Amino acid sequence: MKFLCIYKPSKPEGTPPTQQDMAVMGKFIEESMKSGKLLATEGCLPSAMGARIRRSGEKFSVVDGPFSESKELIGGFALIRTDSKAEAIEFTKSFLQIAGDGETEIRQIFE
């Protein structure tokens, strides 16, 4: 089973991780890639560099960042492979132990 994990940190946007945090996360990523559970992962740049595109009927609207709602800010994503939703949840808990406070939404990918 594949899952898309979307991470929304509680920290204010643009708060950089410490060198130690980066090292611990780097080790977690390396081990997770080797095990085959982590397929891809990347962090996102600040929302000021992004945009939201919406379609309603035949009209499109574009709103440039930054976005003010902190609960809507995406810090990064991961694509993981696990044997079950329960295993994906446990993997995500391990990630959050390192990343810190925040929320990760997991969505199973249609295969």
Descriptions of predicted regions:
Residues 1-111:
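Conserved, structured core segments of small domains
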